[in-house]
From Swiss-Prot:
One of its GO terms (cellular component) is endoplasmic reticulum membrane. Pfam families: E3_UFM1_ligase, UFL1, UFL1_C. Belongs to the UFL1 family. E3 UFM1-protein ligase that mediates ufmylation of target proteins. GO terms for molecular function: UFM1 ligase activity. This is E3 UFM1-protein ligase 1 homolog. It comes from Aedes aegypti (Yellowfever mosquito). One of its GO terms (biological process) is response to endoplasmic reticulum stress. Its EC number is 2.3.2.-. Residues 396-470 are annotated as: Disordered.
Length: 777
């Protein structure tokens, strides 16, 4: 190992000697490469190859070349450019640059660049020159100019050379701003001059634009120079307000308030005041101010309003508040002021419409006629039936159907029970001999149920079925109320308030009219119930009489031959059967609130009543109408008639034979009385044969004139030959008279003969006595 090291030393010495030798004997390039390669292999020599591999250099030599290049480039060099210039790999250059920075503190490595102190000093001189020219400089601008970080420039250049090379001052509020004292002095003078010339509130932005001063510098200096005014804030929209202007504002506000007792917000805002209400409060601390929307009023004006209100209440008149308040006050301001001024007692005695205050006593005197109108209309609605219809619709709308049916059914059952008791203890075969028919347990149709309704919608249940429109009745209109009010307000010049007052009083009078209508309705209902009971009893008697008449007439019809009976039955049902059916239909129509005008009903009218009536009447009434025209016998009709009476809760009285004999006797006397007063030949003959038939058979007969010949044929056995001849001749003359009406000569002759025979015919009928007993029994 020692021998090797000695050999290396010898070779190195030879190599050095050869290099220093001036001799022409030099090593060849190949030998040099071999020697260097051997040294590198042995670790005795460290070299750096160039990028093209043709040259190599040592680490120290590369460091020296980097320093030399930094100097040549003026103290700032980029490593990328340096690597190209030195023809050395970038990584090698970067490592050497880092080594140089470590060895020399004056050299800085920033963003891939090497910078030395000479560069810093040169930049500092440039910054100082620029600062002297502009008066102000920002590190951010230097960053853009020199392409270096702001913090690096600030710490290594600006602050390092401040007051050495860079003659300036750092801004206390912004460390990146530097300015010269002369610049500050000039700016302060500009600001002082501009503010001194301002006499009204001016935006700070306008001042800055005029002076050309940054807002930052203005905010820093304004407190030092603004001795004649103040800046509202440091925001972009700030204003400068001179003290002279603020004094003018305060003087104007105080003087105006002292003279008028109020302040308009728009006028105060026009003085440049932003927060008007606080400004007024601050400038008038001792005054009791009420802030409204458009203005602020003082105690003096409020006292004036209160005094006027008290005078108005004491005199029972009205007050237009706008006449004592400033014209600039809006309706909203007036409402707000009155709500503060009016006490609870005052509010009960007044009505307020806009700016007009009316006392209730003043309005009551004017509106008195409306009470009479409401009562009159209520009476008219009850008399016309419109109120009853309204109550029925209202009940149908709000009451549950099951409750309505059960309630109505119970009411109907009570009425039937009352009628049965009355009939059972009343006239015409009543008492223990009365025949009571069973009534069907059916629900009655829904009608007004007038005893269970209220005069106010508020009392109706709200849980009823909904759908459709609610029942409505208007007993008094706003126009009628307004007309009355207008007549009373017109002398005072307040007719414009009539419609508003009418709207205010309409619910009151509408409720009053409904209450009055309900009161009258209850009275009429009580009277109607009494009349209904009386009518029901009288109709029951009338229908019983018709029923008995038809039954008694049937006995007379049964005495005739079978071929004649159908004609007589048809005529009896068409006349008395129709009367019976009409009476039943009239009753049902009244019970179901159906329209049935007139004293008689046609077939169509009866059928219409059947279709529209309640279900409990429909089947019985339909069968009755059909039986009038289609019954084969009187018994069939009487069965249907009995069912109809039962459906109408009427009692069919028990047959009384003694009463039947009295009825037949009365019927005969009635016919005799008609005969005595009759002069028409055809009617004389008709009455005569009916009287003779009644006397012969002790039965009644209901027949028309066309049945006289059949009755005469039936009576032939009961008549003497002379009587039969006389009646036959009289009958023939009547037929001739009816057929010879066109020939006046024949009519006169026949009429003369009839006049001669009429007394004889009347005598036969009035003096006739039966020769034997022929009875329907």
């Amino acid at each position: 190992m020692t021998s090797d090291w000695d050999e290396i030393k010898r070779l190195a010495a030879d190599f050095q000697k050869a290099q220093l030798s001036t001799s022409l004997q030099r090593l060849s390039e190949r030998n040099c490469v071999e020697v260097v390669s051997l040294l590198i292999e042995k670790g005795l020599l460290e070299v750096i190859f160039t990028t093209d591999g043709k040259e190599y250099l040592t680490q120290a030599h590369l460091a020296q070349e980097v320093k030399d290049e930094l100097f040549v480039q003026g103290g700032r060099v980029n490593l990328v450019d340096l690597a190209k210039t030195l023809n050395v790999d970038f990584d090698r250059v970067q490592r050497v640059a880092e080594q140089v920075v470590q060895e020399d503190p004056s050299v800085k490595f920033v963003l891939g660049q090497l910078l030395d102190v000479s560069y810093f000093e040169r930049v500092a001189m440039e910054v100082n020159e620029k600062l002297a020219q502009a008066g102000e400089i920002n590190v951010a601008d230097l960053t853009m100019q020199y392409d270096l970080p702001a913090d690096f420039i600030l710490s290594n250049i600006v602050l390092k050379y401040l007051n050495k090379i860079i003659m300036g001052k750092q801004d206390a509020s912004n460390a990146n701003i530097f300015f010269t004292q002369s610049y500050v002095t000039r700016s302060k003078a500009k600001i002082r001059g501009a503010l001194a010339a301002i006499t009204k509130p001016t935006p700070v932005s306008a001042i800055l634009a005029q002076c050309g001063i940054p807002d930052r510098l203005f905010n820093m200096l304004v407190n030092e120079v603004a001795t004649l005014g103040s800046v509202t804030s440091r925001s972009p929209g700030a204003q400068y307000i001179p003290h002279i202007y603020r004094k003018t504002q305060v003087d104007w506000v105080q003087n105006f308030y002292r003279q008028n007792g109020y302040l308009e917000h728009d006028s105060v805002a026009g003085l440049g005041v932003t927060d008007v209400k606080n400004f007024i409060t601050n400038q008038l601390p001792e005054a009791k101010i009420i802030h409204l929307k458009k203005c602020s009023v003082g105690e003096k004006l409020i006292d004036q309003v209160v005094a006027s209100l008290e005078e108005c209440l004491s005199s029972n008149t009205y007050l237009d508040v706008s006449t004592i308040l400033p014209s600039i006050m809006t309706d909203e301001d007036i409402d707000q002021l009155l709500s503060m001024v009016l006490t609870a007692a005052m509010q009960k005695q007044t009505l307020i419409f806009g700016s007009t205050i009316l006392t209730t006593k003043f309005v009551d005197d004017i509106i008195k006629p409306c009470y009479g109108i409401a009562e009159e209309h209520a009476k008219r609605s009850v008399d016309s039936g419109s109120y009853q219809q309204y109550m029925a619709e209202k009940l149908m709308k709000h009451q549950d159907p099951m409750d309505r049916d059960s309630a109505v059914g119970e009411g109907k059952a009570d009425k039937r029970e009352e009628r049965r008791k009355k009939a059972a203890g009343g006239k015409g075969g009543g008492g223990t001999q009365g025949r009571e028919t069973k009534t069907k347990s059916t629900k009655k149709h829904v009608r007004g149920q007038k005893g269970n309704v209220s005069d106010s919608d508020d009392d109706m249940p709200s849980g009823g079925k909904k759908g459709g429109k609610d029942a409505v009745i208007e007993l008094i209109t706003t126009k009628e109320i307004a007309k009355v009010l207008e007549a009373g307000l017109e002398p005072e010049g307040l007719e414009d308030l009539s419609k508003q007052l009418a709207q205010h009083y309409y619910p009151q009078f509408s409720k009053l009219a409904l209450a009055k209508a309900h009161q009258l309705y209850e009275i009429s209902l009580h009277q109607s119930n009494q009349n209904r009971r009386q009518t029901h009893a009288s109709l029951q008697d009338k229908l019983n009489n018709l029923y008995n008449d038809i039954r008694l007439y049937e006995k007379g019809i049964k005495l005739f031959p079978a071929d004649v009976q159908p004609q007589l039955v048809k005529y009896l049902l068409k006349s008395l059967g129709t009367d019976f059916s009409n009476e039943i239909c009239f009753y049902v129509a009244a019970e179901c609130n159906l329209n049935s005008n007139g004293t008689t009903l046609t077939v169509e009218q009866r059928n219409k009543i059947v279709q529209e009536c309640s279900q409990e009447y429909k089947s019985a009434l339909q069968a009755l109408n059909k039986a009038v025209f289609s019954s084969a016998s009187i018994d069939d009709f009487l069965d249907v008639a009995e069912s109809a009476l039962q459906a109408c809760s009427m009692i069919l009285k028990k047959i009384d034979k003694k009463k039947d004999r009295n009825l037949i006797l009365c019927h005969k006397h009635g016919l005799l009385e008609q005969l005595a007063n009759c002069s028409d030949p055809a009617l004389v003959l008709h009455l005569a044969v009916l009287i003779i038939f009644t006397i012969c058979t002790q039965s009644m007969l209901h027949a028309s004139g066309r049945h006289v010949s059949s009755i005469l044929s039936f009576l032939q056995p009961q008549l003497s030959p002379e009587q039969a001849q006389t009646l036959t001749s009289y009958h023939d003359l009547v037929l001739k008279l009816l057929s010879a009406e066109g020939s006046s000569s024949n009519v006169d002759d026949i009429t003369k003969q009839l006049e001669d025979l009429t007394p004889t015919v009347k005598s036969i009928a009035s003096s006739f006595k039966k020769s034997g007993v022929t009875s329907a029994e």
